[in-house]
Amino acid sequence: MTAARDVLVVEDDADLAALVAMILDDAGFTVRSASDGRQALARVAERMPGLILLDMRMPVMNGWEFAREFQARHGRAAPIVVVTAAENARLRAEEIGADGWLEKPFELEDVVAVADRFAGRGAPGQADARRA
């Protein structure tokens, strides 16, 4: 079962993950965090989130590996929004079949807008989450 306003933040930068969690918590979301893809798969097994905010470069299991494994196990059970500093963020998001992307650095209100747009929907959406 998908928890509608539950966001899973998959980010190895602890400070950034804490900041995103604080912003989303203040906006009324339930936030769980994982520092790599393997930990994220464990969080998903506990409870399917309404949205996965996914960093691409992480130790242990990176974003590509996580997305591939998540989709093999769960299909499109929760939307994935790629969060990356890569210039080709949209291409990277499309490569893994993500529902959107958010480019680093981002404005804090953009995180809330993306969560509002995608959390709880659980279905594929438009590729451009930057202007939610």
Where are these regions (language model features)?
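Charged docking surfaces used in two-component/phosphorelay signaling
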Residues: 18-26
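Alpha4 helix (beta4-alpha4-beta5 surface) of REC/receiver domains from two-component response regulators
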Residues: 65, 86-102, 113, 117
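Active-site residues of response regulator receiver
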Residues: 55
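Acidic catalytic/metal-coordinating carboxylates
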Residues: 36-39, 62-66
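Acidic, metal-coordinating helix/loop segments flanking the phosphotransfer/catalytic sites
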Residues: 33-51
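Receiver (REC) domain active-site loop signature in two-component systems and cognate sites
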Residues: 58
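Conserved acidic carboxylate
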Residues: 11, 84
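Non-catalytic signal-transmission and effector/linker regions of two-component phosphorelay proteins
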Residues: 1-8, 109-132
